[in-house]
Design a protein with these regions (language model features):
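Bacterial Sec-dependent N-terminal signal peptides
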Residues: 1-26, 45
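Interaction-mediating elements
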Residues: 25-151
Length: 151
């Protein structure tokens, strides 16, 4: 009986270690051509950044998700999920396209930070993160209510 338990324990440990090794080594980040992006991502770039060219594009495959990152010639970084929906846009010193900013967030920023532009916009599971040109970061919940201001 002891021998059988030892064999079962050894088998479980071996399978566990093999699964952990696969999980650890599965991260696959590599450059790709712009044409390999999902159609939605290509359309987003064409619609909102037609005056810019793509500097480089990468795909990051993990066990649970696939993400794409695009860097434009002006330094703007855009992240897309596996279906091509944008997750974040970081323009650093330039303003993000107004068309992608939810109207309630755009209105709040204009009313409270009139001279500032939105330079970073992230969609999060719980809401939105907004980076302003004055260095402030604002967080909004999914109903577009301000929940946090971080400097």
């Amino acid at each position: 009986m002891k021998k059988m338990m030892m064999i079962v324990a050894l088998g479980v440990a071996t399978v566990g270690l093999a699964a952990a090794a696969v999980w650890y080594h599965y991260d696959d980040e590599r450059p790709i051509n712009q044409s390999e992006l999902p159609t939605k991502a290509q359309e987003f770039i064409s619609e909102h950044y037609s005056n810019n060219s793509v500097k480089h594009t990468t795909i990051d495959r993990e066990i649970s998700s696939t993400e794409y990152e695009v860097v434009l010639d002006n330094g703007t970084k855009i992240e897309f999920n596996e279906s091509g929906e944008w997750r974040s846009v970081d323009c650093y010193s330039d303003a993000v396209p107004e068309a992608i900013v939810p109207s309630k967030i755009r209105t709040y920023v204009k009313e409270n930070y009139g001279t500032c532009s939105i330079t970073e916009l992230k969609r999060e599971r719980y809401g939105w993160e907004v980076g302003l040109s004055n260095g402030l970061d604002l967080e909004f919940d999914s109903a577009y209510r301000l929940t946090e201001i971080d400097d």
